[in-house]
């Protein structure tokens, strides 16, 4: 479930209520503050959640993040521009991996590993992405990965002439 905006959180709650997957546990009232509703998962909701977890854990699916799409169109940028953007991504990835690692180190003696698996996974995935982006950036920097309009036109011409 992708919940990115406040409105979609309320829509998600309404749908879960409508479908009987959650129910209202209580409504808390404080003077001068809006009512706060506390929800709890229903037995049906728990069964659906457990089945979803089993499915997602056991079956790799093709997800569609934006980064691979941008990579497929990187030739629309100049190598210089692409390198600049990839270096910005490296900075963000380095900081994020370091932050996750710091959190893992800080809490490993306090929190059982079971509850840190998500962070471990995120760190591993981001570290792999960081390694790839560094490699591609270095290849652009040293000229072993290069393109320009003339080269792209030549490639397009060769590929289309082979199709005919």
What are these regions (language model features)?
Residues 27, 54, 79, 105-109:
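Short, flexible helix-adjacent loops and helix caps
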Residues 79, 86, 112-115, 119, ...:
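Amphipathic alpha-helical coiled-coil segments and their boundaries
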Residues 1-62:
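Basic helix-turn-helix/winged-helix DNA-binding cores
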Residues 12, 86-89, 122, 129:
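Amphipathic alpha-helix face/heptad-repeat signature
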Residues 100-121:
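Acidic interhelical loop/turn segments
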